[in-house]
Amino acid sequence: PLLFASKMKIDAMRDLAGVTLLASIPNAIVAGPKLPGNTLKEAIAYIKDRPGQFNYQAPLGSYSHLDMLALTAAAGIKMTHLPSRGAGETLPALMRGEILISNSNVASNIGAIKAGQIKALAVTSAQRIAELPEVPTLAEAGFPGIGSLNWNGIFVPAKTPKAIIDKLHEIGRAHV
């Protein structure tokens, strides 16, 4: 909401109150089959030797995009950002070799990762995830402080009475 505040009809920070967190989903730095190697370090070395030759894809202004900007800057690599509408567009492009790398949510990519169609090089969470225990975190891969989580939550108008927010929170937590 903050990146697109001028286009929104509400001020999310002023007009909404948080009720409960529903889900928190890490991203993974994923690579297509054309990338040699299986680690983030190998990917960065390959890209660094070929500056400006490769693209990455992420929705413009998204957590994925911002994390990739931070990662490419920290790694000293040059890549072209190709905006996407999300994992539904990015995953096929990775598998076809149209893009080399992406930062996309694990939930949308887990099937292709497990099937060996794409490679997970690192996850954006603070700890390794149970579904991909062999994949290091960005911090473990040498990039501490980079990485965000996708999350979903329930919000209500800011003027909602606290008693109602508390009850909705209780109900939400009981069902998540």
Label for each model-derived stretch:
Residues 43-51, 110-119:
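Basic phosphate/pyrophosphate-binding loop/patch that engages nucleotide-derived ligands
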Residues 69-74, 88-102, 107-117:
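Short helices/loops that flank or line small-molecule/ion binding pockets
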Residues 3-89, 138, 149-173:
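Hinge/capping helix and adjacent helix->loop/strand transition within the periplasmic-binding protein
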